[in-house]
Amino acid sequence: MAEEKKLGLPSVIATGVGLIVATSCLLSIGQGASILGTPFIITMAIACAFNILTALSICELNALMPNLTGGLAQFTLASCGPFITIITNMGGFICCQLILGSSEAAMFGNTLCEVLPSIPVTPAMWSIGLVIILFVLNLFGVDMFAKIQNIVAYGLIGSLVVLGILGCIKINPAAVVDQPSVLIHNYSETFSLLGLAFFLFIGVEFIVPISPNVKNSRKIVPWGMVLSLVIILVMQILMVLGFKNITSWEELGKSTVPHILYGSLLLGKAGTIWMSVVSMLAVISTLNTSIFGVSQLCAGMAKIGLLPAFFLKKTPAGSPYFGMILVAAVISIINATGLSSSDSLVFLIMTGCTFWIFCYIMVHVDVIMLRFKLPKAPRTFKLPFGILIPILGVIGNAFMICNIDPDMKNKMTIYGIFGGVSVVLAVYAFFWCKLKIKRPLFKPYAIKEVMAMDTDLYQIRHYPNLAKKLHLEAQPDVTPLSADTNTGTRPEE
C-alpha cells in the first residue's frame, strides 16, 4: 500500500494563517490604528512576539503528549489537576469562543446592513439568521464547509495583502488623505492596546492536530507556527499603512466594517463588492468552525470526564449536537442584545481575549510544571534555555491582561466579567471533582492515563455506564493472520 503523503512547511503555514485570520480581526486593526496611528504596528509586533512564545510552548507540550483530542485541557490535566483544567479550558476556550463567535456573527450583520441599506433588516436579525442556518447545516455532518473553508480564508488573506499594497503605493491618488502618521505623544502608549493587538494572532494552537500528518513534524510544526504569525503580522502592517494613506483616522474609528470602508475609498464600488463578498464568506467559514469546534471541544472534555456525558451525544451524521445547541443559543442571545457599534464589538472582543490570554498563561505554566515533574521524559521538541521562554510567556501574557483596554472603566468591567465567570466555573469544578469524578482537586493525572483517555478501553474501564450508552466495545485492532502468512520468522520457500 502506498505511503500516505505527508504535509510540508507550505501546507502547515497555509493552515496556520487560514485558521488565525478572521474578519473581526479587521475591526481590531481599524480600532487600534485609529487610536495610535502607525505606532499600532509596534503594538502588533509586541503581541506577535508574545504569541510566538506561546506557540513554542505548545509545541513542547505536543511533543511530550502527541495526538490528544481533548485539546490543551489534557496538558493542564497532567500538570495541575482537574480543578484548574476545568476553569482554564471552559473559560479560556469555550466561553471565549462563544464571545468571539458572537463578534463574528455581528460583523456579518453589520456588513450586510452596510452594503444592503435598503433592506429593512437589523444587523441582529442577519446575524441570528446566519447562526440558525449554520446550526441546522452542522447537524448533518462534519464536512459541510470543509471543501471551501481554506479557499475562503486564503481568499480573505490574499485580498487584504493586495489591498494593503495598493493603499501603500497610493494607486488611487484621488483617495489619498493628508493626515498625521502618529496620534500619540509618548511611545509608551503603544502598550495600552496590547490586549487588542493580541486578538490578531490567536488560534495558532489549532495547527497541532495536523502534526501527525506533517513530515519531520519536530522541526516543521514549530517553524510553521512561527512563520504563520510573522506572515499575518506583515499583512496587518500593510493594512495599517494603507489605512493611513486612504482612510481618515476618525472615520476608521467609527466604522464597524473598516475593511469595506477602506475597499470602497480605494477602489470605489468594485472595492466594496470585492471586500463584502470575501469577508462575508470568511465570516460564514469562521463561524461554522466556531460552532463545530466548540461542540467538539465540549465532547472531548466530556470524554475525559470533565463535562457532563450528554455533550458526547451525536446525531446520526456524527455531530455532537448538545454543544452545537449551546453555541447557537449563546451567540444568538448575545447578538439579540445589539452589537451595532464599534465600541460594543471591541468590548466584546476584549472580554473574550482576557479568557484566552489566561489560557495561554496556563500553557506556559504547564510547560514549567512538566519540566520539573518529568525532566527526563522524551520530547521530540524541547524549548531552549530551560524554562526561560515559558517564564517570559507568563510575564508577557499577564502584561497584556493588564493592558487589555486603555479605558480604566472598560478594563474594570472586563475584569469583573472575567472574575464572575471564573467564580461560577470554580464552583462547578469543585463540586464536579468532589461528587462526580471523585478526584483530588489539584493532583495531576499521570501522563499515561491522560494519553489513554482517548481510547475506548479507558472509557469502558472507568466509565462503564457511559461506554454502554455510547455503544463502545473493546475490539482488537489486529486482524488474525492466516496460517500460510510469512511474518518474517521463517525463510521464504
Task: Place the predicted regions along the sequence by residue.
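Terminal cytosolic tails of multi-pass membrane transporters
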Residues: 1-6, 364-386, 410-493
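Helix-loop-helix junctions that connect adjacent transmembrane segments
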Residues: 2-4, 41, 116-125, 150-276
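The first (N-terminal) embedded transmembrane alpha-helix
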Residues: 9-27, 330-333, 395-397
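Transmembrane helix-loop junctions in multi-pass membrane proteins
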Residues: 25-29, 104-105, 137-143, 270-271, ...
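Hydrophobic transmembrane alpha-helices that form the core helical bundles
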Residues: 31-34, 43, 52-131, 135-139, ...
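TM-loop-TM module centered on a large, flexible mid-protein loop between adjacent transmembrane helices
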Residues: 73-81, 113-118, 226-291, 307-353
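Membrane-interface loop-to-helix entry segments
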Residues: 109, 123-173, 184-186, 224-230, ...
